[in-house]
Amino acid sequence: LYDCDVIATASQGKLEKCVELGADFAVDHRKEDWHKEGKKTATEISKQKSKESEIDVIYEHIGGSHWNKELSLLKYGKTIVTTGATTGYDVMTDLRHIFFKGLNIVGSTQGTRAELESGLHWMARGKMRSVVDSVFSLEEASTAHQKMLSGKDLFGKILMKP
Protein backbone atom coordinates (compact mmCIF):
# COMPACT_ATOMS: atom_id res chain seq x y z
CA LEU A 1 0.00 0.00 0.00
CA TYR A 2 2.73 2.44 0.96
CA ASP A 3 5.64 0.51 -0.55
CA CYS A 4 6.10 -1.34 2.72
CA ASP A 5 7.66 -4.74 3.09
CA VAL A 6 5.27 -6.74 5.27
CA ILE A 7 6.35 -9.64 7.46
CA ALA A 8 3.24 -11.27 8.91
CA THR A 9 3.20 -13.62 11.86
CA ALA A 10 0.58 -16.34 12.17
CA SER A 11 0.19 -19.99 13.06
CA GLN A 12 1.51 -22.56 10.60
CA GLY A 13 -1.88 -23.19 8.99
CA LYS A 14 -2.41 -19.49 8.24
CA LEU A 15 0.97 -18.52 6.76
CA GLU A 16 0.00 -19.19 3.15
CA LYS A 17 -3.19 -17.15 3.53
CA CYS A 18 -1.18 -14.20 4.85
CA VAL A 19 0.98 -14.23 1.73
CA GLU A 20 -2.10 -14.61 -0.50
CA LEU A 21 -3.50 -11.47 1.16
CA GLY A 22 -0.38 -9.49 0.36
CA ALA A 23 2.24 -10.11 3.03
CA ASP A 24 5.70 -10.39 1.49
CA PHE A 25 6.78 -12.99 4.04
CA ALA A 26 5.11 -14.94 6.84
CA VAL A 27 6.65 -16.37 10.01
CA ASP A 28 5.15 -19.00 12.34
CA HIS A 29 4.68 -17.16 15.65
CA ARG A 30 4.24 -20.42 17.55
CA LYS A 31 7.89 -21.34 17.08
CA GLU A 32 10.05 -20.45 20.07
CA ASP A 33 12.47 -18.40 17.95
CA TRP A 34 9.92 -16.75 15.62
CA HIS A 35 11.37 -13.33 16.39
CA LYS A 36 14.82 -14.40 15.20
CA GLU A 37 13.31 -15.61 11.92
CA GLY A 38 11.49 -12.28 11.58
CA LYS A 39 14.71 -10.35 12.19
CA LYS A 40 16.59 -12.54 9.70
CA THR A 41 13.88 -11.91 7.09
CA ALA A 42 14.08 -8.14 7.68
CA THR A 43 17.87 -8.31 7.24
CA GLU A 44 17.52 -10.22 3.95
CA ILE A 45 15.01 -7.65 2.66
CA SER A 46 17.35 -4.80 3.55
CA LYS A 47 20.28 -6.44 1.73
CA GLN A 48 18.15 -6.76 -1.41
CA LYS A 49 17.17 -3.09 -1.20
CA SER A 50 20.56 -1.77 -0.02
CA LYS A 51 19.15 -0.19 3.11
CA GLU A 52 19.66 -0.49 6.84
CA SER A 53 17.99 -3.51 8.42
CA GLU A 54 15.05 -2.22 10.39
CA ILE A 55 11.58 -3.13 11.43
CA ASP A 56 9.83 0.22 11.53
CA VAL A 57 6.45 -0.72 13.01
CA ILE A 58 5.08 -3.76 14.79
CA TYR A 59 1.30 -4.18 15.03
CA GLU A 60 0.91 -6.19 18.22
CA HIS A 61 -2.27 -7.91 19.29
CA ILE A 62 -1.07 -11.04 21.06
CA GLY A 63 0.09 -9.45 24.31
CA GLY A 64 1.93 -11.15 27.14
CA SER A 65 3.60 -14.07 25.41
CA HIS A 66 5.20 -12.02 22.61
CA TRP A 67 5.63 -8.50 24.01
CA ASN A 68 9.31 -8.57 25.03
CA LYS A 69 10.42 -10.44 21.91
CA GLU A 70 8.65 -7.82 19.80
CA LEU A 71 10.31 -4.97 21.68
CA SER A 72 13.69 -6.60 21.07
CA LEU A 73 13.13 -6.40 17.29
CA LEU A 74 12.79 -2.62 17.19
CA LYS A 75 15.69 -0.22 16.73
CA TYR A 76 15.97 3.36 17.99
CA GLY A 77 12.90 5.53 17.49
CA LYS A 78 10.69 2.80 16.04
CA THR A 79 7.08 2.05 16.99
CA ILE A 80 4.98 -0.74 18.42
CA VAL A 81 1.20 -0.40 18.11
CA THR A 82 -0.65 -2.56 20.59
CA THR A 83 -4.22 -3.44 19.68
CA GLY A 84 -5.05 -6.35 21.94
CA ALA A 85 -3.87 -8.94 24.39
CA THR A 86 -4.97 -12.38 23.25
CA THR A 87 -2.47 -14.17 25.52
CA GLY A 88 -2.72 -11.84 28.50
CA TYR A 89 -2.76 -8.23 29.60
CA ASP A 90 0.03 -8.29 32.15
CA VAL A 91 3.62 -8.13 30.93
CA MET A 92 6.97 -7.73 32.63
CA THR A 93 8.99 -5.27 30.59
CA ASP A 94 12.62 -4.33 30.92
CA LEU A 95 12.18 -0.57 30.62
CA ARG A 96 15.68 -0.24 29.18
CA HIS A 97 14.27 -1.70 25.93
CA ILE A 98 12.03 1.34 25.77
CA PHE A 99 14.06 4.32 26.99
CA PHE A 100 17.48 3.39 25.60
CA LYS A 101 15.91 2.85 22.19
CA GLY A 102 13.50 5.80 22.37
CA LEU A 103 10.66 3.51 21.36
CA ASN A 104 7.16 4.73 20.66
CA ILE A 105 4.36 2.67 22.19
CA VAL A 106 0.92 3.42 20.77
CA GLY A 107 -2.35 1.95 21.96
CA SER A 108 -5.14 1.56 19.44
CA THR A 109 -8.66 0.17 19.41
CA GLN A 110 -11.26 0.89 16.77
CA GLY A 111 -9.69 3.97 15.18
CA THR A 112 -11.11 7.38 14.37
CA ARG A 113 -13.75 8.32 11.84
CA ALA A 114 -11.00 9.71 9.59
CA GLU A 115 -9.14 6.39 9.76
CA LEU A 116 -12.34 4.53 8.89
CA GLU A 117 -12.87 6.80 5.90
CA SER A 118 -9.26 6.28 4.82
CA GLY A 119 -9.72 2.51 5.05
CA LEU A 120 -12.91 2.70 3.00
CA HIS A 121 -11.05 4.80 0.42
CA TRP A 122 -8.41 2.06 0.01
CA MET A 123 -11.03 -0.69 0.00
CA ALA A 124 -12.99 1.05 -2.77
CA ARG A 125 -9.80 1.06 -4.86
CA GLY A 126 -9.10 -2.61 -4.23
CA LYS A 127 -5.94 -1.91 -2.19
CA MET A 128 -7.39 -3.28 1.05
CA ARG A 129 -10.13 -5.73 1.86
CA SER A 130 -11.85 -7.26 4.84
CA VAL A 131 -11.38 -10.95 5.36
CA VAL A 132 -14.61 -12.69 6.28
CA ASP A 133 -14.32 -16.17 7.70
CA SER A 134 -18.02 -16.95 7.98
CA VAL A 135 -21.50 -15.45 8.14
CA PHE A 136 -24.16 -16.61 10.59
CA SER A 137 -27.80 -15.69 11.06
CA LEU A 138 -28.87 -14.31 14.42
CA GLU A 139 -30.48 -17.67 15.14
CA GLU A 140 -27.00 -19.21 14.86
CA ALA A 141 -25.44 -16.79 17.37
CA SER A 142 -24.49 -19.58 19.77
CA THR A 143 -22.70 -21.51 17.00
CA ALA A 144 -20.89 -18.37 15.87
CA HIS A 145 -19.82 -17.63 19.43
CA GLN A 146 -18.49 -21.16 19.91
CA LYS A 147 -16.53 -20.90 16.66
CA MET A 148 -14.97 -17.65 17.83
CA LEU A 149 -14.06 -19.10 21.22
CA SER A 150 -12.52 -22.24 19.72
CA GLY A 151 -10.43 -20.32 17.21
CA LYS A 152 -10.18 -23.50 15.14
CA ASP A 153 -10.15 -23.12 11.38
CA LEU A 154 -10.78 -19.40 11.84
CA PHE A 155 -9.25 -16.83 9.50
CA GLY A 156 -10.98 -13.47 9.35
CA LYS A 157 -14.08 -11.98 10.87
CA ILE A 158 -17.25 -13.76 11.88
CA LEU A 159 -20.31 -11.80 10.79
CA MET A 160 -23.85 -11.95 12.11
CA LYS A 161 -26.72 -10.90 9.89
CA PRO A 162 -30.43 -10.57 10.61
Outline where the language-model segments fall:
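Adenosine-nucleotide cofactor-binding segment
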Residues: 1-66
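Residues in the short beta-alpha loop(s) of Rossmann-like NAD(P)-binding domains
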Residues: 12-13, 86, 111
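Terminal peptide-recognition signature
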Residues: 18, 58, 70, 105, ...
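A general structural signal for well-ordered alpha-helical segments in protein cores
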Residues: 35, 55, 67, 95, ...
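Short glycine-rich, flexible loops that bind phosphorylated cofactors or substrates
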Residues: 65-67, 88-89
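Conserved helix-to-beta-strand junction in the class I
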Residues: 72-74
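Rossmann-fold dehydrogenase core element
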Residues: 76-83, 92-134
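C-terminal hydrophobic helical "lid"/dimerization subdomain
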Residues: 113-162
